[in-house]
Amino acid sequence: MLFYEFFRSSIGSRVSVMLKAGVYVSGRLGGIDPYLNLSLLDVRILSSHPGLSSISVCSIRGSSIKYILVDKDAKLLQGVNAGSRLRMILDKCY
């Protein structure tokens, strides 16, 4: 749930998504669910896929995502680091 909370707090910001199929997509994050399924608005396809050039809105299944790039936000990064450390400490205690 750590990454879900991170991306949920990034709704409305620009993200770039690399899919396992090799498609590179950029857009504004419109929504996300706990399975990391994404909804993107104002979509631009950054790789050479001519059939996808006219898409403006898309939904991406979480299991097809290779990685996601977001703008660096120091406050969010500190929250993710703190959450990761806390989870590691709790796992060692139990």
UniProtKB/Swiss-Prot annotation:
Molecular-function annotations in GO: RNA binding
Highest taxon of source: Eukaryota
Localisation: Nucleus
Protein function: Component of LSm protein complexes, which are involved in RNA processing and may function in a chaperone-like manner. LSM2 binds specifically to the 3'-terminal U-tract of U6 snRNA. Required for processing of pre-tRNAs, pre-rRNAs and U3 snoRNA.
UniProt entry keywords in alphabetical sequence: mRNA processing, mRNA splicing, Nucleus, Ribonucleoprotein, RNA-binding, Spliceosome
GO cellular component, one term: catalytic step 2 spliceosome
Domain Sm: 2-74
Example of a GO biological process term: mRNA splicing, via spliceosome
Protein name listed in UniProt: Probable U6 snRNA-associated Sm-like protein LSm2
The family this protein is said to belong to: Belongs to the snRNP Sm proteins family.
InterPro entries to which the protein is assigned, alphabetical: LSM_dom_sf, Sm, Sm_dom_euk/arc, U6_snRNA_Lsm2
One Pfam family recorded for the sequence: LSM
Subunit structure: LSm subunits form a heteromer with a doughnut shape.
Ranges annotated as spanning the membrane: none
Chief location category: nucleus
Native organism: Encephalitozoon cuniculi (strain GB-M1) (Microsporidian parasite)
